[in-house]
Amino acid sequence: MIKHLMMAALMSAGVAAPAVAGVAGFGVVNQTGSAVSGLALRRTGTSDWKSVGGGASDGARTSISFSDPDCAFDLRATVAGHGENVWSRINLCEVKSVTLHRDASGTTWVDYD
């Protein structure tokens, strides 16, 4: 009996609790060449945008605090002189910071930290 209890205890000790995925917040670095305003997020594949903060001047970093069980998001920002720009399918569970870029031709991309 004691042998079975010890085996059960050893087996249960090796079982880890499942990891909880989700976003707890992240940083945004603006490298678009212009001021960014009106940051908003939506879950990738949906149409409902949620405002998550003001913005940042070129070269500045801002912190976004929010919590969500999902990971894949689209980020929208209004870039001064260039209108709304959207960066799609950002996995916010795997990154601490995103750097937004926009070149002279209007091409946008994001780098992850």
List the model feature ranges, each with a label.
Residues 1-7:
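Bacterial N-terminal signal peptides that target proteins for export
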Residues 18-66, 70, 78-113:
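Intrinsically disordered, low-complexity segments enriched in small/polar residues
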Residues 8-14:
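Bacterial N-terminal signal peptides
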